[in-house]
Design a protein with these regions (language model features):
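Chitinase-like catalytic core of GlcNAc-active glycosidases
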Residues: 1-112
Length: 112
């Protein structure tokens, strides 16, 4: 079976994609880890994952998953992202697994 994977980093409206989808997978990019007031946090591109700017993204990805697509996230490796992750592994791993668990339609992770 052929797989068509759509890498989704520029957060555009997915409504047209929902209507006319030919993909089998969507990989949302990119998850990173950083610090705010010395507190480790997880962010998608430049914003915390719980930011209101992602409300529509989460809803649309759930619809796509309900329509049979496999939804994954990519953890970005650019800009020394893995250094923060591995230097703070226990906290970062918990943030990552909590994020995936709380978004039940996310089925896996692509390690860039």
């Amino acid at each position: 079976m052929k797989k068509i994977i759509y890498y989704y980093q520029t957060l555009i409206d997915l409504e047209e994609f929902i209507k006319n989808n030919r993909a089998t997978h969507i990989i949302l990019s990119s998850i990173h880890f950083g610090f705010n007031n010395n507190e480790l946090y997880i962010h998608l591109n430049d914003s915390p994952i719980d930011s209101d700017i992602f409300n529509k993204v989460w809803k649309q990805l759930k619809v796509l998953n309900d329509n049979g697509l496999t939804i994954m996230v990519m953890m970005g490796g650019a800009g020394l992202a893995y250094n923060v992750f591995f230097d703070n592994y226990e906290k970062a791993y918990k943030l990552l697994t909590d994020f995936i668990t709380n978004h039940e339609y996310i089925k896996g992770i692509d390690l860039d």
